[in-house]
UniProtKB/Swiss-Prot annotation:
Name of this protein: sn-glycerol-3-phosphate transport system permease protein UgpE
Gene field: ugpE
Lineage of the organism: Bacteria, Pseudomonadati, Pseudomonadota, Gammaproteobacteria, Enterobacterales
InterPro entries for the chain: MetI-like (IPR000515), MetI-like_sf (IPR035906)
GO biological process: glycerol-3-phosphate transmembrane transport
Source organism per UniProt: Escherichia coli (strain K12)
Membrane topology qualifier: Multi-pass membrane protein
Keyword annotations of the record: Cell inner membrane, Cell membrane, Membrane, Transmembrane, Transmembrane helix, Transport
Function according to Swiss-Prot or TrEMBL: Part of the ABC transporter complex UgpBAEC involved in sn-glycerol-3-phosphate (G3P) import. Probably responsible for the translocation of the substrate across the membrane. Can also transport glycerophosphoryl diesters, which are hydrolyzed to G3P and alcohol during transport. The G3P moiety can be detected in the cytoplasm whereas the corresponding alcohol is usually found in the culture medium.
Length: 281
């Protein structure tokens, strides 16, 4: 029997509320700054009461972009969505098929191939990124959606998670499919894929946010302003040297950039949690 301790309940709830406040307060300050004009943002101290310029600030960056040499912000959002969705679809497809082959196909050195994939997790991004840029440049894929997305579609982490889940499926499923005369791809499409839906949901959320938050890769690959992404665009809004940063516009851009991943997480929240639990079994 679990002993009821009121003081422990009060303490845990207090810490939870404090944690939520610490997380939400910066977002509230960003929201307030997004509703102010330029003069009010630079007032010391800045007011914590929302202003009346939110729609004006949104319209300004939505139409005019985030700088003097910038695409409209709606275009950046579209580029980020195309990049994130393409990376997500590619990662899931490549990882599922590679894990399926490693688990159920019997071929020489299959475990060696898996560990060769897995060991790439130990290589820092800085070690891999410049050779990858060189390859993309040689393939003439700079300033293109293909250059933005293709190099990021392979994932050792996703392959590992799918492999662990596939190994929990009983061998009787394979035998039953073989007796029925099902081909490997028929077995994959009719049995393995439907059983992997919760894992797919979890990896969809993770990989979408991963693709959406990319900063360094677009910065190295893209010079065409019409292919710019939101994260790199926000960084470009912050002035250097003697320039002045329009922090109200920066905060508007940041809040608009937050909306798609937040919506994805909220919509797929339950499936995301189930997928993580199933992957750990």
């Amino acid at each position: 029997m679990i002993e009821n301790r009121p003081w422990l309940t009060i303490f845990s709830h207090t810490m939870l509320i404090l944690g939520i406040a610490v997380i939400l307060f910066p977002l509230y300050v960003a929201f307030v700054a997004a509703t102010l004009d330029k003069q009010a943002v630079y007032a010391a101290p800045m007011t914590l009461i929302p202003g009346t310029h939110l729609l004006e600030n949104i319209h300004n960056i939505w139409v005019n972009g985030v700088g003097t040499n910038s695409a409209p912000f709606w275009r950046m959002l579209l580029n980020s969505f195309v990049m994130a969705f393409s990376i997500t679809l590619g990662k899931i497809t490549v990882s599922m098929l590679s894990a399926f082959a490693i688990v159920w196909f019997r071929f020489p050195l299959r475990n060696l191939f898996f560990w060769m994939i897995f060991i790439t997790l130990m290589l820092p991004v800085e070690v891999r990124i410049f050779p990858t840029v060189e390859v993309i440049a040689n393939l003439q894929m700079l300033d293109s959606y293909a250059g933005l997305t293709l190099p990021l579609m392979a994932s050792a982490t996703a392959t590992f998670l799918f492999r662990q889940f596939f190994m929990t499926l009983p061998d009787e499923l394979v035998e039953a499919a073989r007796i029925d005369g099902a081909s490997p791809m028929r077995f994959f499409c009719d049995i393995v894929f439907p059983l992997s839906k919760t894992n797919l949901a979890a990896l969809f959320v993770i990989t979408f946010i991963y693709g959406w938050n990319q900063y360094l890769w677009p910065l190295l690959i893209i010079t065409d302003v019409d292919l710019g992404t939101t994260v790199a665009g926000i960084k470009g809004m912050i002035a250097t040297g003697e320039g002045t940063t329009e922090w109200n516009s920066v905060m508007v851009a940041m809040l608009l950039t937050l909306i798609p991943p937040v919506v994805i997480v909220l919509v797929m929240q339950r499936a995301f949690v189930r997928g993580l639990v199933d992957s750990e079994k």
